[in-house]
């Protein structure tokens, strides 16, 4: 008999060879219609898996995240089968699951078009309707290579060659289709009913642009048609909010091939950038930070000393000057340690909070670049706090409170915190790890934030907090970080003289609130759908004239507003007023003042707000006072 242990710590005995599905039938009949796979000793396996030794047993159900991932994995296989039946000459490559869906890469001379996706979906539904079983088989390496070679599936042969010798080669069959796969899969194709193929794009074998180009078909799959419909509607909303589209429409920025991964900020976009930068600068100043500026180009020797050369070299932009290798900095932290080291420090100088709006450069493949969200050149709202062990708790608390104040101002109130504690391999003593971890927990608790534990995911040099924002349509964006560092100050020879007269290495807290200004602006644009708060809008007020007689009055109002630091513009064109209103609404201008004969006579303005179709008249002085009350923070 074998002992099978369950999540409630109970244990049952069974004959060796019992299938996972049989255990569910005997002990969990209420899960029969929900079970999609099982876990044996934390490894996900098919329901049909035979259990031959003592183990821990769990059921994976359709309503779990893992269950949904299996549905998507199944659907990727079904799509590959459909395409092989429709286009026999196509070679299959890989088909993993991703966030909200899946994709499959194919090698073929046939160019897939978006118009073909519906036909592929129809073929997939035929396969699903047949309720074909997913059958797992274990093959020898020789059998697998021979089979896929005979089928002309060159990429599968390449994948097999990279599988370690000691690992089994497993394949899955459904109908006439056989694919190299570790699994697990559902019992049959019938579960994958709610799906949609979403787009076609190019890709490269192993993600390397020097390799053969492939075609990638993306899809999404869900448990029910209702979930699918909700997701697809959300996709439409995401497309409407795309910061690249809005950024172009509002003339905020652009990107071009001659400077991939770098932003051309236009006048209005730079206004937003500077408002954010100056707001953060003022908050830092009020919270005891000093601001510094460090070089962009630094010698290879500094990156070797810091440890970044070994771990980060492939992401650096390198050059050679005077026969010496230099790198454009990918991060600011080693530079800040140099400033710390520039003079003798005492414990009385700590904590030292050092901030920089540091422009950094990191290599990202062209395929990974995405508007403002993923770039090669970016500016961090970076700061490093040099402190003693005894100051960690207070500094972490202050940072959490500052971060929450900033997020609320920008319209984010739903914040998820992830706490990553000590990994197995780490630097520093258990005592300092205990103190650091307790400090982070205490800071989150004091800020009235709940956290999710990310066990063992801290860096080898210290634990960390990650702060994730939830936007208006429920998407999550990781922005803020607080990272303890016990190692870099020691590597770079940073020390202070303690009250005992001895030298001590400071603790270094790496921290950021926005992450990068570029990405944060992209998030803001999508969160607000381009309709930024009045204080952040590049143009806060547009004054529109109905007749030529109103031009002088409109211009005088503009000057009056600008003297009060209102960002105002005036439209004195000959267009009809309704056209002007539509035009300025499309530019997301938060406040419109409309000026006609009546307004001139009464020294008033007719006000229309971006989110309202109503107009109301107010004296120009009162209208300006009202605008001033919300035009800055």
Swiss-Prot record:
Family: Belongs to the class-II aminoacyl-tRNA synthetase family.
A GO-annotated cellular component: cytoplasm
Cell membrane recorded as keyword: no
Subunit structure, as described in the record: Homodimer.
Alphabetical keyword list: Aminoacyl-tRNA synthetase, ATP-binding, Cytoplasm, Ligase, Metal-binding, Nucleotide-binding, Protein biosynthesis, RNA-binding, tRNA-binding, Zinc
Residue span, TGS domain: 1-61
Keyword Ribonucleoprotein carried by entry: no
HAMAP family: Thr_tRNA_synth
GO terms of biological process kind: threonyl-tRNA aminoacylation
Required cofactor names: Zn(2+)
Catalytic reactions of this protein: tRNA(Thr) + L-threonine + ATP = L-threonyl-tRNA(Thr) + AMP + diphosphate + H(+)
Main location: cytoplasm
Organism in which the protein naturally occurs: Ehrlichia ruminantium (strain Welgevonden)
Protein task: Catalyzes the attachment of threonine to tRNA(Thr) in a two-step reaction: L-threonine is first activated by ATP to form Thr-AMP and then transferred to the acceptor end of tRNA(Thr). Also edits incorrectly charged L-seryl-tRNA(Thr).
Positions of the UniProt region annotated as Catalytic: 242-533
Subcellular location: Cytoplasm
Molecular functions (GO terms): ATP binding; metal ion binding; threonine-tRNA ligase activity; tRNA binding
Protein name (database record): Threonine--tRNA ligase
């Amino acid at each position: 008999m074998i002992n099978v242990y369950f999540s409630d710590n109970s244990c049952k005995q069974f004959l060796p060879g019992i299938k996972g599905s049989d255990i569910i039938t005997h002990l969990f009949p209420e899960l029969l219609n929900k079970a999609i796979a099982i876990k044996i000793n934390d490894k996900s396996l098919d329901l049909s898996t035979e259990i031959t030794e003592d183990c821990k047993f769990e059921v994976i159900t359709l309503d779990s995240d893992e269950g949904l991932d299996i549905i998507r994995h199944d659907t990727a296989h079904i799509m590959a089968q459909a395409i092989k039946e429709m286009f026999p000459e196509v070679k299959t490559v890989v088909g993993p699951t991703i966030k909200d869906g899946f994709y499959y890469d194919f090698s073929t001379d046939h160019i897939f078009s978006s118009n073909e996706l519906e036909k592929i979906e129809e073929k997939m539904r035929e396969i699903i309707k047949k309720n074909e079983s997913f059958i797992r088989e274990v093959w020898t390496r020789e059998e697998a290579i021979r089979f896929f070679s005979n089928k002309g599936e060159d990429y599968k042969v390449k994948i097999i060659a990279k599988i370690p010798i000691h690992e089994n080669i497993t394949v899955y069959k459904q109908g006439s289709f056989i694919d190299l796969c570790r699994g697990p899969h559902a019992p049959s194709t019938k579960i994958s009913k709610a799906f949609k193929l979403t787009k076609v794009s190019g890709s490269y074998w192993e993600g390397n642009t020097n390799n053969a180009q492939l075609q990638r078909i993306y899809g999404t799959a869900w448990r029910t048609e209702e979930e699918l419909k909700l997701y697809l509607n959300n996709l439409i909303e995401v497309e409407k909010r795309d910061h690249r589209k809005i950024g172009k429409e509002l003339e905020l920025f652009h990107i071009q091939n001659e400077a991939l991964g770098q932003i051309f900020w236009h006048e209005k976009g730079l206004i937003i950038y500077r408002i954010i930068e100056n707001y953060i600068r003022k908050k830092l100043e009020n919270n005891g930070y000093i601001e510094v500026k460090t070089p962009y180009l630094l010698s290879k020797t500094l990156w070797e000393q810091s440890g970044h050369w070994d771990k980060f070299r492939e992401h650096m932009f390198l050059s050679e000057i005077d026969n010496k290798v230099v790198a454009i900095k990918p991060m600011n932290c080693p530079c800040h340690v140099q400033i710390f080291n520039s003079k003798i420090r005492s414990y009385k100088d700590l904590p030292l909070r050092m901030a920089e709006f540091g422009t950094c450069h990191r290599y990202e493949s062209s395929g990974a670049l995405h508007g403002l969200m993923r770039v090669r050149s970016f500016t961090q709202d970076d700061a490093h706090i040099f402190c003693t062990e005894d100051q960690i708790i207070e500094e972490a608390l202050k940072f959490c409170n500052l971060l929450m104040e900033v997020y609320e101002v920008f319209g984010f109130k739903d914040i998820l915190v992830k706490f990553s504690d000590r990994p197995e391999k780490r630097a520093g003593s258990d005592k300092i790890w205990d103190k650091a971890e307790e400090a982070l927990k205490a800071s989150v608790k004091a800020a009235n934030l709940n956290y999710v534990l990310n066990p063992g995911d801290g860096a080898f040099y210290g634990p960390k907090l990650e702060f994730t924002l939830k936007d208006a349509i429920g998407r999550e964006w990781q922005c803020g970080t607080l990272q303890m560092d016990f190692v870099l100050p020691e590597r770079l020879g940073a020390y202070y003289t303690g009250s005992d007269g001895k030298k001590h290495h400071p603790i270094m807290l790496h921290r950021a609130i926005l992450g990068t200004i570029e990405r944060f602006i992209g998030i803001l644009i999508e969160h607000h759908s381009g309709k930024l708060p009045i204080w952040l809008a590049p143009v806060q007020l547009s004054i529109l004239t109905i007749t030529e007689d109103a031009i002088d009055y409109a211009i005088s109002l503009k000057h009056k507003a600008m003297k009060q630091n209102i960002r105002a513009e005036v439209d004195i064109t000959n267009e009809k007023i309704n056209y002007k209103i539509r035009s300025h609404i499309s530019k997301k201008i938060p406040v419109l003042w409309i000026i006609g004969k009546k307004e001139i006579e009464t020294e008033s303005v007719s006000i229309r707000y971006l989110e309202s179709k109503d107009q109301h008249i107010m004296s120009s002085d009162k209208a300006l006072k009202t605008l001033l009350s919300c035009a800055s923070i």
